[in-house]
């Protein structure tokens, strides 16, 4: 693959972080997913549980584009799915690695997005989801590029990597590896499974032809024990290393002491890949994972908030495309975990020590994780919050004042140009909301458990209402934040605020404004660039 191919892949570029149950502070399995795409409207999907007569057919549409791909036989029984978690706490996320372009099959019926949501509707465990998903592509053909899937339940987390076999060839080659319970892992648009233990059937599952097909295509010629799925089907290039693996590195760097050992791989100084999973230096909480989804390499050699590209107000974002040319040389910008083009983001918490309706929480937000608020969505919820739907016909190019996706984008796009000046106001409101939800969780779940002991439907209704209430209150608060920011920072000055209210003087008029001007470093560079043009004569 050339560098340009990797840039194209950034159109649909995502991040998954993983925490095994013995690596988390409360025994949860935890996985995260940011769906990053220019074109993806951030919404919370809901598929109610249902039963179907034998012979019912299901029409399949490509998740990315809405293109009709064909139809498959519907299952007799499907399970409730809200977002990317089902009623049995099974959660599936993904990142696209692309891989060898000649292996795409445009005649397949099952794309990666459909594979996720059909898989969730038909599976009670992660292992069952792997079987359902691989059986589907074997029967109906795999339409998409190479994918890494995170497939999790309250007890196990698996990474499954899959790629097609080429035009008109039904099925896919794939391998699934279980993440050890005491480890963390991640993937971010580059295949991460290298060698795997073909004899460990308990922790490694793979298609029978995963090695032989690579031999047949000329991708591999060694002995089986040396076979690397990633090297065979998604050869490493600069973009895969720097834009994709670097996000995994940032996670490992934060929670292990080995970050410095893996940095040369990210910088292209060695081809020795990072391990698929590592043991963290301390156990991670759900909040730790939420905060990691907001990462921009802060405090590392890849930090982008302090160089010239960060602009006047130290913004840790770079506009698309990531590459640019000056003269005949090509350059790039870093691609952190948190990015402006996210449609939605979640951190899934799955707990084996609680009944399924209570144990599974999808902490869900829309737009950029850095300025999102993660609200609790219980896996038993039978109704998605209206603000998380296509209310008023909202979509990626249709604005609605009642859509959380658009309200959060409205706020974040006010903040991006004046990031260091405005981000603290966002952080304060974000922290207040998330702390409130975190602190309320135990009490809410105790109430739900009491209801569940008497009447499951009452518990489901209670948690559905709580899911909707927290989302709506967050939406209302964020809309108020937006109006507050417009007033406070209007016209490049800052209004004075005390106890959350704009100050007035002794006669009731607005208090005098603060004029922040420009940062010292900018003014020095400004004078350097313009010389004596703006110098005041003596």
What does each model-found stretch correspond to?
Residues 427-538:
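Histidine-centered catalytic/metal-binding microenvironments
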Residues 12-112, 132-284:
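A contiguous strand-loop segment
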